[in-house]
Curated annotation (Swiss-Prot):
One of its GO terms (molecular function) is ATP binding. Belongs to the SecA family. SUPFAM superfamilies: Helical scaffold and wing domains of SecA, P-loop containing nucleoside triphosphate hydrolases, Pre-protein crosslinking domain of SecA. The gene is secA. Keywords: ATP-binding, Cell inner membrane, Cell membrane, Cytoplasm, Membrane, Metal-binding, Nucleotide-binding, Protein transport, Translocase, Translocation, Transport, Zinc. Disulfide bonds: none annotated. Zn(2+) binds at C901, C903, C912, H913. It is found in: Cell inner membrane; Cytoplasm. May bind 1 zinc ion per subunit. The lineage of its organism: Bacteria, Pseudomonadati, Pseudomonadota, Alphaproteobacteria, Hyphomonadales. ATP binds at Q86, G104, E105, G106, K107, T108, D497. Residues 829-921 are annotated as: Disordered. Its main location: membrane. Gene3D superfamilies: 3.10.450.50, Helical scaffold and wing domains of SecA, P-loop containing nucleotide triphosphate hydrolases, SecA, preprotein cross-linking domain. This is Protein translocase subunit SecA.
């Protein structure tokens, strides 16, 4: 019935696409008009569109004409014409949705349509890719189209300078990787002046391989951190004990990827740690809780993380591997000491643990964009998650030509040995007829095992995994050559097309570079054209050979946890209507089968009389495998949702801090904020030592006097005031407030108001950053133990929200107290006239390194009194300061608000330097 209804009414997806066809027809009708325009007139369309926008037109009203302009520019500069389905893809991207497009359907070209249209607003468009190579390639390749239309293109990749980053983000359209965009956001929120910031907002983003970035990497937070104390000896001492454990000493759950000590295991660790001289007393005493943490991380390092699967060892370092793409994740480190535990296990240099300085998850970073869109070949399996988390709709686009790929049923073997033997036979048979083969594996370990087996059989092949990622693009580009055998870890997000016969652009680039190197000069335009013609002719011959052999044969050597990864592997063949074939070879010893279905599957195969070297193919097997994958996907979805619930708590706090910080950066005068902080500190101090309903005899006068000295640098006769007949705490608070404001006004006069405003701003930003980092560390610690609240029948999430709020409230209180204390302890001394002035506020806690330092270091600033140039950094030009500051115990007269202002203006203090509007929090 359902199929009949779909034929009559069409699917939901069909109904989404139907209205787009009318717009495609109108774009096609504009093609002759655009073809008649000169290059200059075509470029002039951009200025025309922008004027129409300024006059009240909308982007949607310009869409058809703008798309026609982009199509014409692509034809002229790149010899590429957008197909009708690609125009539809551009409309879907512009609407803020995800376009599902098969491999080879030209996603890179589709992005130019929506990117150009949205860049007309002048607020910047970000096109996000999965690696630096693709970002550079696409920026160069598609940048020609934008350049022909008068738009600028920027690229943000690892290693570019701050100036290059600023220029890249200032461009109309910016290409870059998800990591760099996220880290730049965090870096910008650690800068000390607006002109140092790189990004200019989050207007519109197009995410390529959107499922890889927003789903697979959603659980991975971006963290900027600084090193803490070296504990390498402790890591080594604990690591040496783990191999002595027996299986009964821990419980391992491979499905949940968790491992914990049993009671006997804990007792053994306690005994061994004591013998090693590391532990004093019981392991479970509060003072030894860090040893419990180290022991747990060492156990995880040994039992959950495998070399050449989860990480590799390269250049005396442990490099993590992306489980979905098989790539090395350079610069990424596991947190909470787990990375150090793995380094101890592998006996490599143990790098210090890091303290979090700033962090954000991809989920929350990409939700910053006012409009978000994405492209991928495999999003439908995760459509509900895109809708739930990101409010993104997935629209499945038809292919430009019918798919001719043959997807065969899985073949299941009882042993891995039998599976690999059959794979080698299949490769040999396909290779004999020059059919190109792509062998997909789930880990480096498996890819190197397969490579070893192929080498033993003298079958020439190339290996693509995290060890050889530098040659990635070239290896993938040549995988469609007749007779090519390519072994690759997960092909997710590779980004380079596998074209039958070879990739023309890649070959031309490489062969031209080789010829120029041999000749010692650049090839002329004619020589380059001749070389291109020769390569194109050779590719056509090889393409025919590959087609005659049946097209690219994708052979999966095991199923991945995610159906999307398997679908992406299949999608590498059958591009643009080419023939192709895909097939998976599986054994019940594979990780996925062993964890989820091994016993049941083995029993069935035994009952059927299947021998170890025989395979079985049946739709039931496919169904069982799909069920296992769905279970894992559902579990991972729940984990990601749970991560987001917790991260949303800290995200609200992060947004509040970052927004407040940005306000401080934009303001040249934060004296209102500083005065409000002083008021809050005084109120809190009086409330603590002189409670409202307490009798005068119950007041803590000694505590108040000491706090006034330490927090506000004031020595006031509070005891005498308290002894006065009928004096109330409000009156004493008023006298304290008057004394504080008077002293601060005098400091401002002596230092000079412009200089004081700069000092206030620098102190405020530095203390805010320092307290925020400490807060993040506390939040990390809270999150690592909050699950234990469930044992007390309390909801960990609600407990986390409550505790995090209390910590945030404490952060704000400490911020006010620290800023006020630091500023009130500044003392002024007249320096000899002939000497330069010095500004040196009291020592303050330094943020961990490498933390971004402010452009003007308040400590040890040496200013030329005539020019205002900082002699320690001549580029830092400020206004000449007032008298130099130093830490002394001088007594200074107070300036009551109704007294004459010490600056000599003749006005009352409250109407001059004290004219600050009090704001209550």
């Amino acid at each position: 019935m359902l199929s009949i209804a779909r034929k009559i009414f069409g699917t939901v997806n069909d109904r989404k696409l139907k209205p787009l066809q009318a717009r495609v027809n109108r774009i096609n009708a504009l093609e002759p008009i655009m073809e008649a325009l000169s290059d200059q007139s075509l470029k002039g369309k951009t200025a025309e569109f922008r004027k129409r926008l300024a006059d009240g037109a909308t982007l949607d009203s310009l869409l058809e004409e703008a798309f026609a302009v982009v199509r014409e520019a692509a034809k002229r500069v790149n010899n590429m014409r957008h197909f009708d389905v690609q125009l539809m893809g551009g409309m879907i991207l512009h609407s803020g949705a995800i376009a599902e497009m098969r491999t080879g359907e030209g996603k890179t070209l589709v992005a130019t349509l929506a990117a150009y249209l949205n860049a007309l607003e002048g607020k910047g468009v970000h096109v996000i890719t999965v690696n630096d190579y693709l970002a550079r390639r696409d920026a160069d390749w598609m940048g020609r189209i934008y350049g022909a239309l008068g738009m600028s293109t920027g690229v943000i990749v690892h290693g570019v300078s701050d100036e290059q980053r600023k220029a890249g983000y200032a461009a109309d359209i910016t290409y870059g990787t998800n990591n760099e965009f996220g880290f730049d956001y965090l870096r910008d929120n650690m800068k000390y002046s607006l002109d140092q910031m790189a990004q200019r907002g989050h207007h519109y983003a197009i995410v390529d391989e959107v499922d890889s970035i927003l789903i697979d990497e959603a659980r991975t937070p971006l963290i900027i951190s600084g090193p803490t104390d070296d504990r390498s000896e402790l890591y080594m001492a604990v690591d040496a004990l783990i191999p002595r454990l027996e299986d009964s000493d821990f419980e391992l759950d491979e499905k949940q990827r968790s491992v914990v000590f049993t009671e006997t295991g804990s007792e053994k660790m306690e005994e061994w740690l004591t013998e090693a001289g590391v532990l004093e007393g019981s392991l479970w005493e509060p003072s030894n809780i860090s040893l419990v943490h180290h022991s747990n991380q060492a156990l995880r390092a040994h039992k959950l993380y495998a070399r050449d699967k989860d990480y590799i060892v390269k250049d005396d370092s442990v490099m993590l591997i992306d489980e979905f793409s098989g790539r090395m994740m350079e610069g990424r480190r596991l947190s909470e000491g787990l990375h150090q535990a793995i380094e101890a296990k592998e006996r490599v240099d143990i790098k210090p643990e890091n303290q979090t300085l700033a962090s954000i998850t991809f989920q929350n970073y990409f939700r910053l964009y006012k409009k978000l869109a994405g492209m991928t070949g495999t999003a439908l399996t995760e459509a509900s998650e895109f809708a739930d988390i990101y409010k993104l709709e997935v629209v499945d686009l038809p292919t430009n030509r019918p798919v001719r790929r043959l997807d065969e049923d899985d073949v299941v073997y009882r042993t891995a040995k039998a599976k690999y033997n059959e794979i080698i036979k299949e490769v040999r048979a396909a290779n004999a007829k020059a059919q190109p083969i792509l062998l997909g594996t789930a880990s480096i370990e498996k890819s190197e095992l397969l490579s070893h087996l192929l080498t033993a059989q003298r079958i020439p092949h190339k290996v693509l995994n995290a060890r050889h990622h530098e040659q990635e693009a070239f290896i993938v580009a040549e995988a469609g050559v007749p007779g090519a055998v390519t072994v690759a870890t997960n092909m997710a997000g590779r980004g380079t097309d596998i074209q039958l016969g070879g990739n023309f652009d890649m070959r031309l680039e490489n062969e031209r570079a080789a010829k120029e190197k041999a000749l010692g000069r650049e090839l002329s335009e004619g020589e380059t054209s001749l070389l291109g013609a020769q390569i194109r002719a050779d590719i056509e011959v090889k393409k025919k050979q590959a087609l005659d052999a049946g097209g690219l044969y994708v052979l999966g050597t095991e199923r991945h946890e995610s159906r999307r990864i398997d679908n992406q592997l299949r999608g590498r063949t059958g591009r643009q209507g080419d023939p192709g074939k895909s097939k998976f070879y599986i054994s019940i010893e594979d990780d996925l089968m062993r964890i989820f279905a091994a016993d049941r599957m083995d029993a069935v195969m035994r009952r059927l009389g299947i021998k170890e070297d025989e395979g079985i193919t049946h739709p039931w097997m496919n169904k069982a495998m799909e069920t296992s994958q769905k279970k894992i996907e559902e579990r991972n979805f729940e984990i990601r949702k749970n991560v987001l619930k917790y991260d949303d708590v800290i995200n609200d706090q992060r947004k509040a801090i970052f927004e407040q910080r940005m306000e401080f950066l934009r303001s040249d005068d934060v004296s209102d904020v500083i005065e409000e902080m002083r008021e809050s500190v005084i109120e809190a101090l009086v409330a603590r030592t002189m409670p409202e309903k307490a009798y005068a005899e119950q007041w803590d006068i000694t505590g108040l006097e000491e706090s006034l000295k330490t927090d506000l640098a004031l020595d006031l006769p509070v005891r005498e005031w308290a002894a006065e007949e009928g004096v109330a705490n409000e009156e004493i608070a008023g006298r304290i407030r008057e004394a504080v404001e008077g002293q601060y006004a005098e400091l401002t006069r002596l230092i000079g108001e412009p200089q004081m405003r700069r000092i206030e701003k620098q102190f405020l930003l530095q203390v805010l950053d320092m307290r925020w980092r400490e807060h993040l560390q506390q939040i990390d610690q809270l999150r690592s133990v909050i699950h234990l609240r469930s044992y007390g029948q309390r909801d960990p999430l609600n407990e986390f929200k409550r505790e995090a709020f209390n910590l945030f409230d404490t952060l704000l209180g400490e911020l006010r107290a620290t800023v006020t204390r630091s500023l009130m302890h500044i003392r002024v001394q007249q320096a000899p006239q002939q000497q330069p002035q010095q500004v040196a506020p009291p020592p303050r806690p330094q943020p961990p390194q490498p933390a971004p330092q402010p452009p003007q270091q308040i400590r040890e600033t040496k200013l030329d009194p005539d020019t205002g140039v900082n002699e320690m950094n001549p580029a830092d030009k400020t206004q000449p300061p007032g008298p130099a500051l130093h830490q002394a115990e001088d007594d200074w007269t107070n300036t009551p608000r109704n007294s004459a202002c010490p600056c000599g203006s003749g006005k009352k203090y409250k109407h001059c330097h004290g004219a600050i509007e009090t704001q209550k929090a």
